[in-house]
Amino acid sequence: METQATLNSIQKAVWDGRLPLQIRLAPSESRIYDQTDPYLISYPRISYLPSLLPRLRAFFASSLIDPSSNAHDGWFSFEGVPLKWHLPIGLLYDLYAGADPASKGTAESEDAGWDIDDQDNPLPWRLVVHFSDWPDEELVRLDAEGMVMNDAFINSVKEADFLRNGTAKGIMSLSKEDSSGLWKSVQNVELSSFQRISNILLPPLNQPFRNIPIRIFLPLPPDSGSPSLKIVQSPVPPLIPPSSVAASQLALSRSSITPQTQTIGSALHSLLPNLFPSRRTPVLAKPVLHGAAVPMSAPVEELVRSSAYGDGWLYVVIRMMG
C-alpha cells in the first residue's frame, strides 16, 4: 500500500484536473439561431454540469426566445445525446468525446491553449445547453433549490460507503453539517474540506475495504443506435482469495497462504475476460480513469483512495484499442 502522502498527492492532481468547455445555446431557443456567442470555460473534471446552469442562464439571457425559463430548467447535450447530469463532467467527456487517453505530450498541448474553430479537435468539448423541451424519458428533472442534485450525490456516497465497509453507518452517522459539507466541498472543489469529511468514511490504511466501489462503462457498438450506457457493476474484493488451492490443501496450509492484491487488471479479467484475456497487459481494450490510461498493475483499493470521484466511486471507462 502506498503511503497516505503519496495517495494525497495523486488525489490533489485528480482534483486539479480541468476540462475546457465550449457551450452554445440550442439554436432553436436563440433569438439569433446559431449566431449566439459560445460560453467558454475551463472547468474541474470532478464537477457536475448543473453547477454551470446559473451562470449559463445569465450569460444567454438576452438571447433566449423564452425569457421565463429558469436555470434549473437547463440540460446539456452532446451531438444530440442528453447528458446524465448525475455523472461528473470528466466521466462524461471520457464516455462521449472519444479522445485517446491523455499522455504527457497531450497534456502539455492542452495547457498551451485551444482553437475553438478547429472542429476536428476534441478540445474544447463542445456542448449544447437547452432551457426547454426537457427529455423526461432520459433525465430526472432538477429543482430550483438543488436538492435533487444533492440527494443523488448523497445516495451515491451511501452506496459506495456500503460497499467499502459492509454498512452505510458511516455516512448515516455524519452530522448534518458534514453531510451537506461533503457535497459543498465537491461543488466548490475544496479538497481540504473534502478530505476532512471523507476520511471519516474511509477505513484506515491497515484495514482493507470489504469491496471496491467500482462501475465499469463499456463502449457501445457503432451500429447500436442507442445513446444508453452499458455499465458493469459487481462486488470486487481488494484481495484475491487463493481459490486455486484445493479445499483440503487450503485447510492444511491456510496459515501459509496469503491472498493476492486485486489490481485493475485482475478485476477486469474477472469481470470481462473476453475484453481482458490478460491480467497484466491490455490486448483488446484499456481502462481509462480521469482521462488517463490506468496501469493494469494498479491496486484497486489504492485507486479508490487516491482517484475516486467525489461520491467515492471509481468510474472506469473501457476504450477499445486499434
Curated annotation (Swiss-Prot):
One of its GO terms (biological process) is autophagy of mitochondrion. It is found in: Preautophagosomal structure membrane. Conjugated to atg12; which is essential for autophagy. InterPro entries: Atg5, ATG5_HBR, Atg5_HR, ATG5_UblA, Atg5_UblA_dom_sf, ATG5_UblB. The keyword Transmembrane does not apply. GO terms for molecular function: Atg8-family ligase activity. GO terms for cellular component: Atg12-Atg5-Atg16 complex; autophagosome; mitochondria-associated endoplasmic reticulum membrane contact site; phagophore; phagophore assembly site membrane. PANTHER family: AUTOPHAGY PROTEIN 5. This is Autophagy protein 5. It comes from Aspergillus oryzae (strain ATCC 42149 / RIB 40). The gene is atg5.
